[in-house]
């Protein structure tokens, strides 16, 4: 059946430009690339684009930490990201940046249209402000306890445990991620996108049946809890685009980040000198298809804010969102200490890209399920499937064809019915690729590979080769095996681009989806060269060890107090619980005759007096100034006999020593005898 060629625009979520690409990122880019390559094989016009997400406070602060400009940092990171994606043969037509003139113009255009249409609201809000750093704190730079499920250590915009979204001011016991200080509240005028105005449209889009069931169900929960206006502005200092006619106010990174899809495509059109495609793909009534491959952690932004922004600014909405789960390694979250937090570049130093592309593909489905990269299973599956079943099929037949028949295949098929079984599978396998049921496609292909190898085993060309007068049979059997290999590699072409190149060189023909309907008859193949090498666990061990070493090398050198006075060995809670810390009032403080380091302190523990010798004289040359001050002491320390008398405890102080000793004091209201817990 002839397919009508479609116009398709495909995007992956934009990697953030403050860190390297790792194997978790690669799941999405591989999934999208396999789907895109299949669409291209079927004759569709596909534009596959991405960009770096290059704005926000994290980038600003990291650049400061590195002593370079944000522009320099994101430029270097973009080159690294593009090198990694090229190494994994991700076939992007364009890779751009949100820090671009195209993105600035489109962000301002969408904002102005939303404002003209009454969807931008101004109001003064109270924000968390870091008093130590002198800056308002973005959502991701505040952590605290989730106000909904009470999970600790959650960011200021959404909870990674229950998925709830909220304002940073709703966090329980918030702390600044930048300085560790407790934020204070300050007022600031902000701009809000009126998301609730689009509730009806979004619910209709949800019910259209296009979205994954899990996404639609999650969206329904959000509708039931009520949509809120969305804060789209941030205060200076901020690295991003300044909002027109609003000095000191910047677009929130999540406003201009998805617009980066449009910016990258506009950049591609401009490079091509194409003045019509941008409008053709993005206009309100566009018939082109638009798909976003994203992770489950950013569904909220892509399923609510993004389509509403597009609707409100008179652009088309996505055709669908293709959402995937996370990657675990060996059944657990990726870990730097275990060496399973693996960068894309590190992987390519130890394995080829096709191996990971195959393993991920074999495990992917259209559902939002997490994928486990079990490294032992990875080795076994790559060897069993790619090497033993597919590549071996070619190698065990090619030798006879090259040596005995000068590389020329038979003029007729030895088993036309078996070949038809292989080509008839194109519909089922194609539908699996189309619907992103990648694991099913691989299972179907490997079942065919088993059939092909069974055929060769039964025909035993190595036996036939020794029998006189059976040259025609030998040529027919081996030609059949090579033709079946060709069909298998055609089905696997979206997954294994580098192996496909080598297979095409051997077969002396391009692999096309429609081409398999005609077998290679009387066709000359090239001399066979090894197509793929087996892998082993030693490579895995080297990969893990290299990842550990990279973490050590990348560790930020410790500076300041920790460099001179490292944190001591970890103790248990039971050990700590033995220490009884109490608030004490300094009733008297005096020099100790015969010592140039000690002060004698008389402490009131709320009904009990203690005599303590403390080596703080260098920092407190006037002991009388300490009288009447509250401090903290270790109350259950065994008395220590000294030359000057008995010391009945220890007062708590911080600092490196000398003049830099700082006696600790409790907050106002604490009374002598209060226990420190």
Swiss-Prot record:
Name of this protein: Methionine--tRNA ligase
Catalytic activity: tRNA(Met) + L-methionine + ATP = L-methionyl-tRNA(Met) + AMP + diphosphate
Single GO BP term: methionyl-tRNA aminoacylation
Xref: NCBIfam families: metG (TIGR00398), metG_C_term (TIGR00399), PRK00133.1 (NF001100)
Organism expressing this protein natively: Escherichia coli O17:K52:H18 (strain UMN026 / ExPEC)
GO cellular component: cytosol
Residue numbers covered by motif 'KMSKS' region: 333-337
Motif ('HIGH' region): 15-25
Domain (tRNA-binding): residue spans on this chain: 575-677
UniProt family annotation: Belongs to the class-I aminoacyl-tRNA synthetase family. MetG type 1 subfamily.
Record note on cofactor: Binds 1 zinc ion per subunit.
Keywords, in A-Z order: Aminoacyl-tRNA synthetase, ATP-binding, Cytoplasm, Ligase, Metal-binding, Nucleotide-binding, Protein biosynthesis, RNA-binding, tRNA-binding, Zinc
Recorded superkingdom: Bacteria
């Amino acid at each position: 059946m002839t397919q009508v060629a479609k116009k398709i625009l495909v995007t992956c979520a934009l990697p953030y430009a403050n860190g390297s690409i790792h194997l978790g990122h690669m799941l999405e880019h591989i999934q999208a690339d396999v789907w895109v390559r299949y669409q291209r094989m079927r004759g569709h016009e596909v534009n596959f684009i991405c960009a770096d997400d290059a704005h926000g406070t994290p980038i600003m602060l990291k650049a400061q930490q590195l002593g370079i400009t944000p522009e320099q940092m994101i430029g270097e990171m973009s080159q690294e990201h593009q090198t990694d994606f090229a190494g994994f043969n991700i076939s992007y037509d364009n890779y751009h940046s949100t820090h671009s003139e195209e993105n600035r113009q489109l962000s301002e255009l969408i904002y102005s249209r939303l404002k003209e249409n009454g969807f931008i609201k101004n109001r003064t809000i109270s924000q968390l402000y870091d008093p130590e750093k002198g800056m308002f704190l973005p959502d991701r730079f505040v952590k605290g306890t989730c106000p909904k499920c009470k999970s600790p250590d959650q960011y200021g915009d959404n909870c990674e445990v229950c998925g709830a979204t909220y304002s940073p001011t709703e966090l329980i016991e918030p702390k600044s991620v930048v300085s560790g200080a407790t934020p204070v509240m300050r007022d600031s005028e902000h701009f809000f996108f009126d998301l609730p105005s689009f509730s009806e449209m979004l619910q209709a889009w949800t019910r259209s049946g296009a979205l994954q069931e899990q996404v639609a169900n999650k969206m329904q929960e959000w509708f039931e809890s009520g949509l809120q206006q969305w804060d789209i502005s941030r205060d200076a200092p901020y690295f991003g685009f300044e909002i027109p006619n609003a000095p000191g106010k910047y677009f929130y990174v999540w406003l201009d980040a998805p617009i980066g899809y449009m910016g990258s495509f506009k950049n591609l059109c401009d490079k091509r000198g194409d003045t019509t495609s941008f409008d053709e793909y993005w206009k309100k009534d566009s018939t082109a298809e638009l798909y976003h491959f994203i992770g489950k952690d950013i569904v909220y932004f892509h399923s609510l804010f993004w389509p509403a922004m597009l609707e409100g600014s008179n652009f088309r909405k996505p055709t669908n969102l293709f959402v995937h789960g996370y990657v675990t390694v060996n059944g657990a979250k990726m870990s730097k200490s275990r060496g399973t937090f693996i960068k894309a570049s590190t992987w390519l130093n130890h394995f080829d890209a096709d191996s990971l592309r195959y393993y991920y593909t074999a495990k992917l489905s259209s559902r939002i399920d997490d994928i486990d990269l079990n490294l032992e299973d990875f080795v076994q599956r790559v060897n069993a499937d790619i090497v033993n079943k597919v590549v071996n099929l070619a190698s065990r037949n090619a030798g006879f064809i090259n040596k005995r028949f000068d590389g020329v295949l038979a003029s007729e098929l030895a088993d036309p019915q078996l070949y038809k079984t292989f080509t008839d599978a194109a519909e089922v396998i194609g539908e699996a690729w189309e619907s992103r049921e990648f694991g099913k496609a691989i299972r179907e292909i490997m079942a065919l590979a088993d059939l092909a190898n069974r055929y060769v085993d039964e025909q035993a060309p190595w036996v036939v080769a020794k029998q006189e007068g059976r040259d025609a049979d030998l040529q027919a059997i081996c030609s059949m095996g090579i033709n079946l290999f060709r069909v298998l590699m055609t089905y696997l072409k979206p997954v294994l681009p580098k192996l496909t190149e080598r297979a095409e060189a051997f077969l002396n023909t391009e692999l096309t989806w429609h081409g398999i309907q005609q077998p290679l008859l009387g066709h000359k193949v090239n001399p066979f060269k090894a197509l793929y090498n087996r892998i082993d666990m030693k490579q895995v061990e080297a990969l893990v060890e290299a990842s550990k070493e990279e973490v050590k090398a990348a560790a930020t050198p410790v500076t300041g107090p920790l460099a001179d006075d490292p944190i001591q060995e970890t103790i248990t809670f039971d050990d700590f619980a033995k220490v009884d810390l109490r608030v004490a009032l300094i009733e008297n403080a005096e020099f100790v005759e015969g010592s140039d380091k000690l002060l004698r302190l008389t402490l009131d523990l709320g009904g009990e007096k203690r005599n303590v010798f403390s080596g703080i004289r260098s920092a407190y040359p006037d002991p009388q100034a300490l009288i009447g001050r509250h401090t903290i002491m270790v109350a259950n320390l065994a008395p220590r006999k000294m030359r000057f008398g008995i010391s009945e405890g220890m007062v708590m102080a911080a600092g490196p020593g000398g003049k830099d000793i700082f006696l600790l004091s409790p907050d106002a209201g604490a009374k002598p005898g209060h226990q420190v817990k």
